[in-house]
Amino acid sequence: MSRRRAHDTEDESFDHRRNKRRRVSENQEIEDRLESLILRVGERSTSSVESNLEGLVSVLEADLGTFRLKILRILSDCAVRMPEKCTVYTTLVGLLNAKNYKFGGEFVDHMVKTFKESLKLCRWDAARYSLRFLADLVNCHVISATSLLQLLDTMIDVSNEDTVPQVRRDWFVFAVLSTLPWVGRDLYEKKESALESLLLRIEVYLNKRSKKHHNALRVWSSDAPHPQEEYLDCLWAQIRKLRQDNWAEKHIPRPYLVFDSILCEALQHNLPQITPPPHHASFEYPMPWVVYRMFDYTDCPDGPNLPGAHSIERFLIEEHLHHIIETHHHERKDCAAQLLNFPFKHKIPLEYCIVEVIFAELFHMPTPRYLDICYGSILIELCKLQPGTLPQVLAQATEILFMRIDSMNTSCFDRFVNWFSYHLSNFKFTWSWDEWDSCLLLDAEHPRPKFIQEVLQKCLRLSYHQRITEMMPTTYAKLIPAPPVPNYKYTNEEAANLPGITVALQLVGAIRQKCTPEEVVNILKEIPNTGYSGEEMSDGSFNALKIDVFVQTLLNLGSKSFSHSFAAISKFHAVFRALAETEEAQICILHNIFELWSSHQQMMVVLIDKLLKLQIVDCSAVATWIFSKEMTGEFTKMYLWEILHLTIKKMNKHVIKLNTELSEAKEKLSKADSSSSDTDEDTPHKRKKPITHADKPSEEVVERMEEKLEAANVNQKRLFLIVFQRFIMILSEHLLRSDTDGRDPDTDWYRWTIGRLQQVFLMHHEQVQKYSSTLETLLFTSDLDSHILEVFQQFVALRA
């Protein structure tokens, strides 16, 4: 009997577990179905958005009892992750609130929590979308207009904070302004005086804020034909225009208007008092930007009109397109399809809007959000999907950019070159070059011939020399790059008179016979330590002739391809290290690479990158070489600055890596210590598994890591000091010489050079920012010429 009872109990237990698993599985299926329904609501289907919403409300209302928390989480996630469907979800919440007031209150609390958490964690876009959602709930009678205005007023209070960065104050004002298109009409009808008071406070702030950063972020220095407006100024002008139109905009879909009779009967909730978290030194705020304008209504005569620069519709359309790129940029085909499937495409000249927004992203200062090639690949997919219209709009945009290139920012010039050469390579290098031949009459340093020259250099990297020669009209002969072949001086006609010729020929034979690095060292010992003049050098000096013979001979033998060159450098790495003991010796190596490969810019870039990776040359040596007198003729060419930026990036990555490793080691050490103390305090039955000695770094290891990081920071600071000091020297010399000779200093060379200085500041702003006080004390002092000093002051203003 007892056995039977035990057997029955086991069966009951098994049935209970099986039923529990079934219930869990069924619940998971229902949750997944609910999530799918909520995510897809309002998307294209056979029924209307309103019908979709009514059906979904019925489903959710029935499941609120069981899946309340899940529904709250999904809806609040949608509010942040799918801002383009904001009004669809606010309508859904409004209808649920009308049927279940308690759920409406819970959702508002949940949304407020999301908003506060986003502010605390510096998730600025998520915070702005949360605020927009809360504001739109006023239109759905979920939240009272009075409590929303209190929140907006509290956010504008931040604009009066003292001793905080302007970028913090700017963001809170921007968040409020960008919310008003959704809720402005309702606030105007219900609380007009309070709304006007809010706008007055915003205007007072905007009138007194500094815009020192503005010129550094402009794509063009000229405002003709389109003004390059600072983002807050532009949005303020758009909001003022909206106010003049009595807050009536024509872009935002408002499905809740259909349900007004239901929603207006619902009880409203008041937002709690929300205080923005105080500023902390670790907080990073979005940097300011300049609104990019390329087209106006005269550029797109056919079809619907392009909204004016100060219409709120222009802001809303651009923001939506930027969000599509942000969401889908990882997959270029999906991104292009989503852009062309823009919901309001029949109301606007969509191709013009898309092209303008993509170039706005590409030319965004200080740096684009994504790699240049991301935007190029999306434009190619757009041309494939819309072959009848988009290539023509893109050609029109290219023409506009080329005609305005005289006043284009140097960083944007580089990006334009990179994009156009890549685009040409995907369309058989076809272009109507004859239309641009007027640039051939201009000085070689003028941006237009310079642009074509740099484009052809980039095309050479993506093709081959004969192809470039064939594709260009004969009139462009002077701009076509020289054939990319090595200039090995020990085989020239005058080679017999060169001091190192005998050893060079001996070295060629030995390397071809696959000699060892030791044998190369022995051969090089035959070269005495003399300069090129033949005079005996002191023992402490590097042997320039030895470096000359070795570097030029080895790299000439490896000139067949990048791989051959890399293999040669790797095999004789020890010889390079022995020869490159001092910075002067390293500069000599770079000089010989340039002498050998002066007609092959890409080879120079990849070889110097390789030498940096193998630590044969230091970053400071590369910087010093770039500013040396022998490189004067190359100074305005793009490849030289490509080398400088990859050098700085190499140093920056090294510092960041050491910083990360040190932080992780300190964290492990801290956790190990706390784990050890916790283990001592725990009871034997609840003892935690301690962190092993293998996982825990010793204090000595951490100290060594700190020393390494400190040394890296010193080297990084030295690199920036070298770069900026050289810029100041050559620019000051130019300005002084121009003043003495009574010439206009504003030459093409000067504009390129000041542009490159600005580019270094902006491209590496996160790392340079650490040393801004040092730079101000040592280099960018008040007695410096105002033209140079202004570049530094604009940079500092970006984070001020």
Curated annotation (Swiss-Prot):
Residues 31-243 form the MIF4G domain. It is found in: Nucleus. Residues 1-25, 668-700 are annotated as: Disordered. InterPro entries: ARM-type_fold, CBP80, MIF4G-like_typ-1, MIF4G-like_typ-2, MIF4G-like_typ-3. Keywords: mRNA capping, mRNA processing, mRNA splicing, Nucleus, Phosphoprotein, RNA-mediated gene silencing. The keyword Nucleus applies. Gene3D superfamilies: 1.25.40.180. GO terms for biological process: 7-methylguanosine mRNA capping; mRNA export from nucleus; negative regulation of viral genome replication; nuclear-transcribed mRNA catabolic process, nonsense-mediated decay; primary miRNA processing; regulatory ncRNA-mediated post-transcriptional gene silencing; RNA splicing; siRNA processing. Belongs to the NCBP1 family. Component of the cap-binding complex (CBC), which binds cotranscriptionally to the 5'-cap of pre-mRNAs and is involved in various processes such as pre-mRNA splicing and RNA-mediated gene silencing (RNAi). The CBC complex is involved in miRNA-mediated RNA interference via its interaction with Ars2 and is required for primary microRNAs (miRNAs) processing. Also involved in innate immunity via the short interfering RNAs (siRNAs) processing machinery by restricting the viral RNA production. Component of the nuclear cap-binding complex (CBC), a heterodimer composed of Cbp80 and Cbp20 that interacts with m7GpppG-capped RNA. This is Nuclear cap-binding protein subunit 1.
